[in-house]
Regions:
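Short loop/turn segments that flank or connect secondary-structure elements
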Residues: 2-5, 10-202
Length: 202
């Protein structure tokens, strides 16, 4: 009941001794000897926030392994409100739901590429993974300020109008959270673990 963080669901400890890590994108040997990049690059505050935002273990798994998506979201909302939202703020339903609508784009994004060899911003050419950039020049528009988010969502656009539509979706979700955060105001709960890490004592 106290275990809140999803671990590797392919690990033999989860499957009666069967090691299923060979079916992962990274392979068993890499998984066996390394932490996922998210372990190092997503901050403790961001991880705790994701745990509070996402009830679905599946969606949590998709998001916590997508470093760019997580970092960009919290950067954009932090720029808008002038501070990093504390994990405790997501105990308020309005803020949790607003953030959840953004991260649910991992499964609902209307501009997601139908290519089966895409994995977030990466595609597999048969021998290695590479990043497929969005050709904004071909689409007749400037590079989007949300480019990193678009790549994380495996975006593929038919034209410039779709890029603008996609930008409107992202901007609306970011602005919604900023507006709600300002409206909620006040102090938010500070978890005991966070107090210890930051040296705060009550």
């Amino acid at each position: 009941e106290d275990e809140r963080r999803v671990g590797c669901l392919l690990h033999p400890l989860q499957n009666g001794g069967r090691d299923l890590r060979g079916v992962s994108f990274y392979g068993r040997e890499l998984c066996d000897g390394h932490f996922c990049p998210s372990y190092h690059y997503i901050s403790e505050v961001e991880k705790r926030s994701l745990i509070k935002i996402l009830d679905s273990w599946y969606l949590y798994g998709l998001c916590v392994t997508d470093i760019d998506l997580v970092k960009e979201y919290f950067r954009l909302v932090s720029d808008g409100i002038g501070e990093m939202p504390p994990p405790g703020c997501f105990e308020r339903p309005a803020l949790r739901d607003a953030a959840g609508r953004f991260f649910s784009l991992k499964t609902t994004w209307p501009f997601r590429s139908s290519s089966v060899n895409r994995f977030g911003k990466y595609y597999f050419d048969g021998s290695q993974y590479m990043i497929r950039p969005i050709d904004y020049e071909r689409l007749g528009v400037d590079k989007s300020v949300f480019d990193m988010i678009f790549l994380s969502l495996s975006s593929e656009f038919a034209g410039g109008e779709e890029v603008k539509e996609a930008e409107d979706i992202i901007r609306s979700l970011i602005d919604d959270f900023i507006r709600l955060y300002r409206r909620e105001g006040g102090s938010f709960p500070v978890e005991e673990e966070m107090k210890t890490e930051t040296g705060e004592h009550g």
